[in-house]
Each structure stands twice: as structure tokens, then as C-alpha cells.
A protein has these predicted regions:
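Glycine-rich, charged/polar anion/phosphate-binding loops
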Residues: 245-247, 271-272
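Basic, amphipathic alpha-helical recognition segments used for DNA target recognition
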Residues: 253, 263-331, 336-349, 353
Length: 379
């Protein structure tokens, strides 16, 4: 009621002693969070931020960070950026050319349905691109049914090459691959991971490009990237160059590593999940644990708790994006053996439930109560 507003008196020092001097509503919960963690987190931020704000900074200050991690003990507070490394991934600038969808996924079915219409809409604008072969069939859908997936990919690639990258819509994916075309990441050599795979072998590899559905805990990525020697050479040679279709290769040292990831666009709650050994793109924020006192399953539980979503919205960033530099500012409590055991068991159970289908709401309730009360002490 704006005619009878609440008046809350708060000393200016509260905001000056808060991380980033953020202005927050002085509710009972927020003031309790401030009392327990406000000055501690600000001191950590002031000391460490310039040393962890980029993956390059983390590498530059590697020895100091290792010594700091070794000094941590249960109950200590540390910024997530001091406990992990990682960052944004690859921006191909031409996903249609490089990215395919696994044939057994719902995304593949969507592509099978949309391809004829995409082709028809383009040819209506560019009738000179219609071939004699296409005219033999009653519809473009029937025409496409006569082609193999490799032939369809070649057709769409050639039309894009001739008429422009976005003729089917920016970022439209039209390639479908079988699982047998995807390489076993564990069998790849270091050279193949770094420089690409010969096309005489399966040369697609798993590709994590974010998750619009917002899955927590686990999701087997439905996408794969053509990691051929030719493609990798182009991506690396042209990274950062100006012009349409020029890629940006970020943080390649983290490619093919297991870790944690989330989409940078979220709704109300953060949704973190296990990242399999894959290439990750610019929309898939990824971090990798480097402190055995704070393992990834524990971090996974903390980020997936409702409290951390609330903390981010109140004290770090209240927009609809949660990027890597937001994550690096998260306060993480170094767990006791008992807390670590609880979170490890819960994370494994949640992942197992996710593999079977949906996760019961009781799992989230159990997690929220534990993180808020037992870990952060907000009773």
C-alpha cells in the first residue's frame, strides 16, 4: 500500500559493508544473512575478486589459490570462484553448420517436422534455387524423405553457403546424427581433443549448448558438434575475427572435462546439473571443482538450493541471467564430514531419480531445509 508505506531504518554502514554495496530490503531474513555473512563475504570479495574474476586471473594466481584452499577448514566461508575454475565456452557463430541433434531425442523429431517448412519458406523467397529433382515430388516433405541424413545436411549446407548463413533462421539446427556417429570421448587422444578427429572415424562429440527446459541435477546432452580436423582448424584460426560467421573459442582448456553447468538464462530458480565430458558453448556456463574439501556434488546441492537462488537475487544479480561472474561471487560454506556425506548421498539420489524420470518434490524440500538450516545456520 503506497499510501501507507513501511519505513525501515537501516544504518548506512550496513550497505557499505555488503558485497558490491548492494541495496537490499532489510527484511528479517536478509538482515540475518547480513549479520552472519555480510562483512565476511565483502572481505573475501575485496581480497580475492581481482584474482578470480576471469579464468586467466585464476590461472595467474594458481599458487596463491592452492595455498588458500589448503588452509580452509569446515565452517569457513569461501567464494565459489576460489574453489573452482571454468567459464564460458565456444561460440561457433554458425550452429547449423557444426551442431547436430541425436536421432533418438525429441529435438530430432522437431527437426524432422520443421525441415520441410524451412525449406519451403526459403524456396518461396528464392525460387531460382529449386532444382529439377525437387520438382519431381509432390511436396518438399516427400522430397526430403528420399534423402539420407547426410544428403539433407549437404543440401542445407550448400544452400546456406550460396545464399547466406541465416536463410533458415538464425541458429536453426537441421542435422541429425546416430549415436554410432558420436565418438567415445574417453578413447580420444589429446591431439584429437585439441585439433580434431579424422572424418574416417566417428567425429561428432557431445556438445552442451545450454538447456531451455531448465533441468536440474542431470541431463544427457541431445547435441553433438562435428569435431573434425577441418572444422577445428577453422574455429581456432578464425576465433575472434570480425565478420559474419566468425567464431570465438573460449577456455578450450576446459573442453572434454566433467564438471557442473547451467544455462545463463534462468527463471526464478537456479538449475545446476552435472556436465558430461563435452564441448560447452557460450550459453552453457561451466565450472570445475579444484578443491577436494568442497567437491562438485556438494557445490551442486548448494547451487540447487532455494536459498542460493534467493541470495543471488537479493545480493548479487536480480536480472534473468546468472553468468559465470555471478557464480564466482557465491559464498560457499566448507562442509563438515557429515554435511558432505548428506549432500553426496542426496545428489546421487537426485541424479538416479532424474535418470528414471522426474524428481519428487520431497527431494527439493529435504535439500532446502538442510542447506538453509544445517549448512548456513539460518534457523
Amino acid at each position: 500500500d503506497l499510501s501507507l508505506p513501511d519505513h525501515l531504518t537501516v544504518p548506512q554502514s550496513v550497505y557499505l559493508n555488503t558485497q558490491n554495496s548492494v541495496i537490499f530490503k532489510p527484511s528479517a531474513l536478509n538482515m540475518r544473512i547480513y549479520e552472519l555473512y555480510g562483512e565476511k563475504v565483502k572481505a573475501l570479495y575485496d581480497k580475492w575478486w581481482d584474482k578470480i574474476k576471469t579464468s586467466r586471473d585464476i590461472e595467474k594466481n594458481k599458487r596463491e589459490l592452492e595455498e588458500y584452499r589448503a588452509s580452509l577448514k569446515p565452517g569457513d566461508v569461501a567464494l565459489l570462484g576460489c574453489l573452482t575454475e571454468g567459464g564460458q565456452g565456444l561460440a561457433t557463430a554458425n550452429n547449423g553448420k557444426y551442431i547436430a541433434v541425436r536421432s533418438t531425442t525429441k529435438w530430432a523429431n522437431n527437426i524432422r517436422i520443421s525441415r520441410p517448412k524451412k525449406l519451403a519458406d526459403f524456396l518461396a523467397r528464392k525460387p531460382e534455387a529449386i532444382t529439377v529433382e525437387m520438382r519431381r515430388y509432390s511436396s518438399y516433405a516427400v522430397f526430403l524423405q528420399t534423402l539420407s541424413e547426410a544428403e539433407i545436411a549437404e543440401l542445407f549446407d550448400s544452400l546456406k553457403e550460396q545464399y547466406g548463413r541465416d536463410i533458415f533462421g538464425q541458429g536453426y539446427l537441421y542435422k541429425i546424427v546416430e549415436d554410432c556417429e558420436i565418438a567415445d570421448v574417453d578413447s580420444l587422444t589429446d591431439d584429437e581433443k585439441e585439433n580434431g578427429i579424422e572424418t574416417t572415424k566417428p567425429y561428432y562429440v557431445p556438445y552442451d549448448k545450454g538447456d531451455k527446459d531448465g533441468n536440474r541435477w542431470y541431463l544427457e546432452t541431445p547435441f553433438a558438434i562435428a569435431w573434425s580436423k577441418e572444422n577445428v582448424r577453422f574455429l581456432k584460426t578464425n576465433s575472434g575475427k570480425k565478420g559474419e560467421g566468425m567464431p570465438v573459442v573460449r577456455n578450450p582448456q576446459f573442453y572434454f572435462r566433467e564438471g557442473l553447468c547451467w544455462s545463463d538464462i534462468n527463471t526464478t530458480f537456479l538449475k545446476c546439473r552435472i556436465k558430461q565430458k563435452s564441448i560447452h558453448d557460450v550459453k552453457s556456463m561451466s565450472v570445475f571443482g579444484v578443491c577436494n574439501k568442497v567437491p562438485e556434488n556438494y557445490i551442486l546441492c548448494v547451487i540447487n538450493s532455494t536459498l542460493i537462488s534467493y541470495y543471488v537475487d537479493t545480493f548479487i544479480n536480480n536480472t534473468q541471467t546468472f553468468q559465470i561472474n555471478d557464480a564466482r561471487q557465491l559464498p560457499i560454506i566448507v562442509p563438515t564430514v557429515e554435511q558432505l556425506s548428506f549432500c553426496d548421498t542426496l545428489a546421487k539420489d537426485a541424479i538416479a531419480q532424474k535418470l528414471k524420470g522426474e524428481i519428487p518434490q520431497s527431494v527439493q524440500e529435504k535439500l532446502d531445509d538442510f542447506i538453509k538450516c544445517q549448512v548456513f545456520g539460518l534457523v
